[in-house]
Amino acid sequence: VLGDERMGVGVAVAPRAVLTAHYLVLGASSVHVAAFDGRERAVREAAVDHETGFALLHLDGPELRPSPLAPTGRLPAGAPVFLLTCQDENERKGASGHVMVVGPFEAFWEYMLDQAIMTTVVNPGLAGAPLFDAQGLLVGIVSLGLSAVGRYSLAIPIDLFLERREEMESGARSPDRPFRAWVGFYPQAFDGGVAVTGLVSGGPADKAGLTRGDLLLSVDGTAVGSLRDLYTALWRKGPGDTVGFQVLRESAILVVEVIAGDREDFYK
């Protein structure tokens, strides 16, 4: 789905660490980084956080100058922002706009944020672009272009990296953070509810018998009418737990029990 070769951009957040969008390196057998000086840095390790959507690339080689970070709590609607990106390693592009809203966001790959940055900035280059405020402080990483649905770009707030920074730098998950159930499906919300539009081949939902076109009615007895309802109910469970999905399939209502997996383990 993501392709055999992917290109993106990132931003230095430490002398030997670059932050980018996680799907750019997800499942990659090798990752290469070319810095602004044209010199390649070897990637020693890529720390991927599926919950936030960030990847932190740990580099060897000459140090980079890290960008100063700023929490997004002071980003009101209308605040000016700009991004920096490129389409290849020999160019740099910029674009500016304004914050539309900082608010909830849900996506079909079992992904949900309580606070995402929606902006009017049109990204003229690759994903993973750093988003800055008017003072040049890093406030987010541009993950998606959403012009097809009336929004130009979405950025993951840097606040989430600050919360997970110690874990991503050390590679050790905090014992205080619960594991989330993952079933490997692609649900889409519409006026009548939530439907399964695809499955991860070999994932828990695929193995359990959920099928494309199933209309999801409830999760463990909790009715779901939106992606937020669905993920909130699903994430009450953890890997190894059984999750009961009540579905409408053609004209029949049935319950499909799925043994939840761990997304991080699946994509290692």
Show where each model-derived region lies.
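Active-site-proximal beta-strands of protease catalytic cores
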Residues: 18-21, 74-87, 127-148, 167, ...
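PDZ-domain C-terminal substructure recognizer with occasional recognition of PDZ-binding tails
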Residues: 42, 169-173, 177, 195, ...
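C-terminal cap/linker of serine protease catalytic domains
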Residues: 83, 134, 138-191, 242, ...
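Gly/Ser-enriched beta-turn/beta-hairpin loop segments
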Residues: 46-53, 102-117, 172-180, 186-193
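Conserved PDZ fold ligand-binding element
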Residues: 14-22, 139, 205-227
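Flexible, gly/ser-rich surface segments that form the specificity/activation loops bordering the active-site cleft
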Residues: 67-114, 147-153, 165-178
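Conserved active-site neighborhood of the chymotrypsin/trypsin-like protease fold
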Residues: 3-8, 12-93, 115-116, 125, ...
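A short glycine-leucine-enriched loop at secondary-structure breakpoints
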Residues: 9-11, 70-74, 130, 204-215, ...
